[in-house]
Amino acid sequence: MKKEVCSAAFLKAVFAEFLATLIFVFFGLGSALKWPSAMPSVLQISLAFGLAIGTMAQALGPVSGGHMNPAITLALLVGNQISLLRAVFYLVAQLVGAIAGAAILYGLAPYNARSNLAVNALNNNTTAGQAVVAEMILTFQLALCVFSSTDSRRTSPVGSPALSIGLSVTLGHLVGIYFTGCSMNPARSFGPAVIMSRFSSAHWVFWVGPIVGAATAAIIYFYLLFPHSLSLSDRVAILKGTYEPDEDWEESQEERKKTMELTAH
């Protein structure tokens, strides 16, 4: 566990999560600014969030996995895909990155366009219960897309994971904006809420909904649909950060990379 945390690769991954989340939040929230001469549309905001997540997943995904989302990180922990310490460090990096991205946007945007900095809220008479279920469903489909498109066990061509994930985020926003402004990501909700000091009584919705939705997707995907044939000791080693994959796993990783490179050209 200590070896993992002290490695250069681990530190780079944590920084990549911070940077990717910062950029994602900056561009996502920036698309929702209410400029007097050009009010944002639902399509514009949806595409911006999708393009931002897809771009960062493509750019920094090879370094950290490109989570940029506490719900996804916790779901991967539930699915026994990452170590406990990695999850903790990623969560901190994501939350700090989200605050930094929102802070930069707040400093750049003029007062008349800044408004509430796109803080998530319950819209159109949506109740807290309805909002939680909506966020669960929205994040559930995102998490399934992430798990499937990045599964190293898949040998058939899967196209671009970054594109798939970007489209999944766009899809979620096209529906979710009408309910909650669409979170699907506790960091995205937390960052602007901190900068604007606007924690509503329903802020918990944007944590519970996405986390439960993503965790449910992890249980279904990693334990029911496509379970890993790992021993208990291997699962504990993954959780501790001491697991070392065998050569067959590494070879399958290389084959998948070659497949993805071919489909990208």
Curated annotation (Swiss-Prot):
A GO cellular component annotation in the UniProt record: apical plasma membrane
Segments dipping into the membrane without crossing: 66-74, 181-191
Pfam families linked: MIP
GO process terms (BP): carbon dioxide transport; cellular hypotonic response; protein homotetramerization; water transport
Domain of life: Eukaryota
Segments on the Extracellular side according to the record's topology features: 34-39, 109-126, 180, 192-203
Record carries keyword Repeat: yes
Motif (NPA 1): 69-71
SUPFAM superfamilies: Aquaporin-like
Intervals of motif NPA 2: 185-187
Glycosylation sites: N124, N125
Keyword tags: Cell membrane, Cytoplasmic vesicle, Glycoprotein, Membrane, Repeat, Transmembrane, Transmembrane helix, Transport
Membrane topology: Multi-pass membrane protein
Residues spanning the membrane: 13-33, 40-60, 88-108, 127-147, 159-179, 204-224
Cytoplasmic side: 1-12, 61-65, 75-87, 148-158, 225-265
Record's subcellular location: Apical cell membrane; Cell membrane; Cytoplasmic vesicle membrane
Reaction equation(s) it catalyzes: H2O(in) = H2O(out)
GO MF: water channel activity
Subunit description: Homotetramer; each monomer provides an independent water pore. Interacts with TRPV4; the interaction is probably indirect and regulates TRPV4 activation by hypotonicity.
Family of this protein: Belongs to the MIP/aquaporin (TC 1.A.8) family.
Stated role: Aquaporins form homotetrameric transmembrane channels, with each monomer independently mediating water transport across the plasma membrane along its osmotic gradient. Plays an important role in fluid secretion in salivary glands. Required for TRPV4 activation by hypotonicity. Together with TRPV4, controls regulatory volume decrease in salivary epithelial cells. Seems to play a redundant role in water transport in the eye, lung and in sweat glands.
Domain free text: Aquaporins contain two tandem repeats each containing three membrane-spanning domains and a pore-forming loop with the signature motif Asn-Pro-Ala (NPA).
Protein name: Aquaporin-5
